Regions:
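A general structural signal marking secondary-structure boundaries and capping sites
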Residues: 59, 158, 173-176
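Surface-exposed cleft-lining segments at the edges of enzyme active sites
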Residues: 153-158, 187-191
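Feature marks short, surface-exposed loop/turn motifs that line or immediately flank catalytic pockets
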Residues: 48, 123, 145-149, 193
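Conserved strand-turn element in the central/C-terminal portion of the radical SAM core barrel
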Residues: 169-194
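Conserved phosphate-donor/acceptor-positioning beta-strand/loop module used by diverse small-molecule
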Residues: 141-143
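Residue-level recognition of short, structured coil/turn motifs
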Residues: 49, 156, 177-180
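Conserved alpha-helical substructure of the radical SAM core
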Residues: 2-138, 154, 163, 167
């Protein structure tokens, strides 16, 4: 939801009033409790279909806990009215495993909140690409390898998942181009000691 001057409204520096409120509140919860975030990271589901060697949340045990769509959907308009401008769906599991992720994206968009994802990309299927990609500002895919064998070792999954992710990226990129979407599609990788 950038403005006409291409100033990214999601950066804290563009919200001096909110910064002032935070500084004034200090450690006083009564003053701080009405200062809301500009950006949120939400984990729609606790389950993950990979067991990455670098995972920082593996300690939670990958419980298959999902956000309840109805309750979360009711909160989205409230969040927007309180100043939340963007939500990144990522977190403690693979966000695209949520059975109603496309409905979550639609409800988030309808509330006027910008949407982004961090995903391993295995579940980024045609339905997600066609229904959610047009409503999303950016998607970051965790590829983390250049070969299927290395990918399988790092992600603790089958080698075929690497090819599936690469195919999904290609499909998303073609769909973006064919439909004139502005959604940024990127990959992340990392360096690990051998």
């Amino acid at each position: 939801m950038s403005d006409d001057y291409a100033i990214d409204g999601h950066k804290l520096a563009y919200h001096p009033q909110r910064i002032g409120q935070l500084l004034d509140a200090g450690d006083d919860w009564e003053k701080a409790k009405s200062i809301y975030p500009i950006y949120m990271e939400v984990s729609p589901v606790g389950a993950c279909n990979h067991r990455c060697t670098f995972c920082g949340v593996d300690y939670i045990g990958y419980k298959s806990i999902s956000l309840e769509f109805k309750k979360f959907g009711e909160r989205l308009k409230e969040m927007a009215s309180l100043g939340v401008k963007s939500i990144m769906y990522a977190g403690e599991g693979e966000p695209l495993l949520h059975k109603r992720i496309n409905e979550i994206v639609r409800a988030t968009h309808d509330a006027g909140i910008d949407i982004s994802f961090t995903t391993n990309g295995t579940q980024m299927d045609k339905t997600f690409i066609e229904s959610s990609l047009p409503l999303t500002q950016w998607v970051k895919l965790s590829v983390n390898a250049a070969t299927a064998a290395t990918y399988a070792g790092i992600h603790q999954t089958k080698e075929r998942d690497f090819n599936k992710v690469i195919e999904n990226i290609a499909q998303a990129t073609h769909f973006k181009r064919d439909h004139g979407l502005t959604c940024a599609i990127g990959v992340q990788t990392l360096l690990l000691p051998e």
